[in-house]
Amino acid sequence: GGGGSGGGWVALLGAPPPAMAARIAQLPPVRDEPPVDEAREVQARGALRLRDFVRQWRGPLAIGLALVGLDALLGLAGPLLVRSGIDDGVVGHDGLALLGASLAFLAVTLVAWWDQWAETIWTGRTGESMLYALRVRLFAHLQRLGMDFYEREPAGRIVTRMTSDIQTLSQLLQNGLVSALVGVASVLGIAAVLFALNVRLALAALAVLPVLGAATVGYRLVAARAYDRQREQVAAVNAHLQESVAGVKVVQALGREQAGLETFQEIGLAYRRASLTALGVQALYVALADLLATVATVAVLWVGGDLVRSHALAVGALVAFLLYVTQLFAPVQQLAQTYDTYQRALAGLRKISGVLAEEPSVASRPGAQRVARLRGELALAGVSFRYPGASRLALAEVDLEIAAGQRLALVGETGAGKSTLLKLLARFLDPTEGRVLADGMDLRDLDLQSYRAQLGFVPQEPFLFSATIRENIAFGRPGASRADVEAAARAVGAHEAIEALPGGYEHVVGERGRSLSAGERQLVCLARALLVDPAVLLLDEATANLDPALDAQVQAAITAVATGRTTVVIAHRLSTAEQMDRVVVVASGRVLEDGTHAELVGAGGWYQRSWEATRAALAAGSAGAGDAATAVG
């Protein structure tokens, strides 16, 4: 028997039987996921009001409200039990009544403890779910906004919206909202009990409430402005900090550390002043609430003591009244602090709502046509474009046709309009006038996502995510095989350099690819663009940051890969333009010259002069400097 029993325990503690193991394997995984409709949040549009946002969560909040109501009711029971214990047990010399009141008070305290625990857990989880939903909504909206928004708004200010401003809502939803609900319920319940116990004493206790109400109205008006200013200043601090960190090499190279510190101190002091203003308003209001609570207590003690002396009120009732007054003004003071949290949250919500109210400057029209595969014919028909707030056109009446499979270089001086033209082709911008066409179709009539899926885009400033090299190359095609990733890297001449890194393709590049050289980052960006097998390649001088040896290698790779694909390159080096099928010179937002390299070299225009200057610099032994000095645009 003993051996059988021991064997049973061994079986119980060891591996389960195969049938049980199979059933366990079929069980769904245990997940602690928030009850958030992510699809709804992603599709949500327009400004956000706190009332509307809270209404979406009325079910979970109703449960929290029930727990809050129970908390308030249990709080009302305590002073009544104290009155019973004093009047019936102590004054009445009834030990059983005193014991009953004491045990009842203990039971109420235990239930209140459980209720507060459940209330904290439930409201905390609900609050975190609400904040998660808001973060999803805000991030999805940020992904939709056009380039004009990001060119207008500092990155630090955008980060503030997603972090600090949402954190102010977190304090309200997880703590402040519960405190406010408990406070309101407690104040109403206590007021009702006070009038039930003694009307005269209740009026004495509540006489200060009109003064507190008037102070609250004034506080609301002043605090709203103070906290708006505070949110603006913290965003300015974050924006300056992010810009300073991003440009630290320039700051140190030019010895501008002290100037940067002085600017930061100026912004920091402005934030401090805004915070102190808000703090001063809050301190004045909280101190006034404390003063009024003391006045109410003194009034109850004075009037109540007189009633006890005249035998119109029992001692236990007066003690209960004093306890209720303490309970009355504790939530009132808590409401004052909660109102401070509410004002902070409201200021943050206004900033978040301002971002959510931003309309994407570029979006798919209703019923937009999805495109499977473009031939690659591109055209600009009478295109003009003006940036918001600009006094002049960036592009003016541009007509340009690019045949499928043609490789075209855009050249010109800085500010000529080349980058704007490339952004229009990528549909980062829509023209102010005219049409941009792909295969004869207006880009505004095409589904934006399906159109951009046809593009391979490489910016002049290479950007990599904090991930492995393989993940960065496969960013536009996450399901790509290792062989496909390697093939793209080989095509741009990056394979050997990647293999030489620790971990090879699994090497983590760090934020913005900081563990790689500028040339390596650009090669990875090129491989990323090529991996999606685009119908159209848009390159903002993809070789501008490469040394001469890598430049020749990548130029050869681009020439091979561009075969059969429409390619538009902003050429900062005329050596790049020389290898293209066609060259377009852009000046003052217009097409100045258009032809092959051979044609333009003999046309006597801007291109010929720039080319001759480049050749002269090469002959003088300053190839890199000459090329950059005469052809960068």
Predicted regions and their residues:
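An intracellular "coupling" helix at the cytosolic face of ABC transporter transmembrane type-1 domains
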Residues: R55-G59, M147-D148, S164-L173, L177, ...
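Membrane-integrated ABC transporters
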Residues: G1-L76, V90-A104, E119-T123, G127, ...
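Juxtamembrane helix-loop junctions of ABC transporter transmembrane domains
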Residues: P35-Q43, A66-L67, L74-R83, D87, ...
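Alpha-helical segments in transporter systems
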Residues: L48-R51, G59-L80, S84, A101, ...
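Transmembrane helix-loop-helix hairpins at lipid-water interfaces of multipass membrane proteins
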Residues: G59-D115, F195-R200, V298, W302, ...
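Transmembrane helices of ABC transporter permease
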Residues: P60-L70, N175-R229, V300-L313, A330
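ABC-type nucleotide-binding domain
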Residues: S364, V371-G633
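Hydrophobic alpha-helical segments in the permease module
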Residues: A104-Q116, L209-T216, Q282-A296, W302, ...
